[in-house]
Amino acid sequence: MIAKEKKIKTISLTSVKYSKKAPLSNLNKRLFEITDIFIDNKIPPGDAIINIKNNMVGPASTITGSFILNSILIEVGNILKNEKIFPFYISVNMPNAKENNDKLEKKFRKINPHL
């Protein structure tokens, strides 16, 4: 709600079906109801997808969440690949990472002093 007050756009990754079965938050809303964009990962209530001896195991939200978020990052990177300063931290194990990351921090430190 603080983000809404500050006019900051929000995105959530959640299971709408699972959320509808869970108790309401203290705001009487569910996560997908208060974000500007929600991505439904379609995970069933209970977050388990494998039946072993009539016991559901195997949380799926970790797998789908990681896949969805990394797919979004890859696509954003593809869209922004021609920017003067590539707006992503590069792993320190990659060539030119320090140079890229230093430029990135310098450019964005004014709006994010934690860099």
Residue ranges and their predicted role:
Residues 1-73:
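Glycine-rich phosphate-binding loops that contact phosphosugars or nucleotide phosphates
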Residues 78-115:
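Active-site phosphate/pyrophosphate-binding segments
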